[in-house]
Amino acid sequence: METSIQQLQQEIDGYQIRNAKELEAFKLEFTVRKGKIAGLFGQLKTVDSADRPRIGQLLNALKLSAEAKVADAESLFAQNAETEAPALDLSLPGRRSFLGSEHPVQKVLGDMKRIFTAMGFGIATGPELELDEYNFDRLNFPPNHPARDMQDTFFITRGQEEGDVLLRTHTSPVQVRVMLDEKPPIRVICPGKVYRNEAISARSYCVFHQLEGLYIDKNVSFADLKATIYSFARQMFGSDVKLRFRPSFFPFTEPSAEVDVTCYLCGGKGCRVCKKSGWLEIMGCGMVHPNVMRNCGIDPEEWTGYAFGMGVDRTALLRYKIDDIRLFFENDVRMLSQFMA
């Protein structure tokens, strides 16, 4: 028995393991449950009881020797695999990163700015948190006007000495600040975010973007206003766009009008979006009310002017033929990615 152990030890020591295939063959021959080492352990019961402890120690040493040879071979193969791994190929092209896109509302707003600045309008901005004085009083809103009610306006504080503080309901306060700070002639557009306490639906939202325009000079007429709006509409919606002006009322303009374009979905035939009328409103406009000019320190006997205002989000709906304004505020990448340049 001792001689057999010595012979098997010599076989293990002399066994060459150069690859994974030879390693697997070594395991099958020596270390598996039916291998040579296990066979010798099976013969241990035939050994004289006096010699059995010593022979058992020799067998355990033989088993450990075989297991150590397997472990050394596996470690060596693992190291070789790491060193033989292909190096980083710096000539390979980089992975293309995902590029976002400009939001459709911002795209439309950018186009609006370019159109009006090409006409000679400057750009003015102001605070979104406003005083009642600039949002209503100086714009000729009477004290009992519905817009002053909490059902329509987000008030921050009320009854303060400096006046009520609110989230602006339009960008007209920017026009007021411009008229107070600058002398005519004035030609500006006022883009920005506005807030109204409205029910959220496919056509309205509690926060949206607005662009208003103001032009004050000598002998400005309603014909000048119409020419400006026609020029804008053709550049924004195409040369074949049709417009109509409807008489309306706004506290800050007189006379006042609302401007409609043919419905983008039905082409003027009438559908759900245009409420079967064939027209969609895009803006309000009119000649600046004399009271507004007086409130801002401008003499209406010397100067005249026009103003207009439109929803940027609604204009984006028209341009891209989208029927739900809420899509602009959900930040759904599936929708926004359609507007990549």
From Swiss-Prot:
Q: Give the co-factor note.
A: Binds 2 magnesium ions per tetramer.
> What EC number is given for this enzyme?
6.1.1.20
Keywords, A to Z?
A: Aminoacyl-tRNA synthetase, ATP-binding, Cytoplasm, Ligase, Magnesium, Metal-binding, Nucleotide-binding, Protein biosynthesis
The UniProt annotation places Mg(2+) binding at: 254
Required cofactor(s): Mg(2+)
Query: Superkingdom of this entry's organism?
Result: Bacteria
What catalytic reaction does the record list? tRNA(Phe) + L-phenylalanine + ATP = L-phenylalanyl-tRNA(Phe) + AMP + diphosphate + H(+)
- What subunit structure does UniProt give? Tetramer of two alpha and two beta subunits.
Q: What is this protein called?
A: Phenylalanine--tRNA ligase alpha subunit
Protein source organism: Chlorobaculum tepidum (strain ATCC 49652 / DSM 12025 / NBRC 103806 / TLS) (Chlorobium tepidum)
Upper lineage is:
Bacteria, Pseudomonadati, Chlorobiota, Chlorobiia, Chlorobiales
**Which gene carries the instructions for this protein?**
pheS
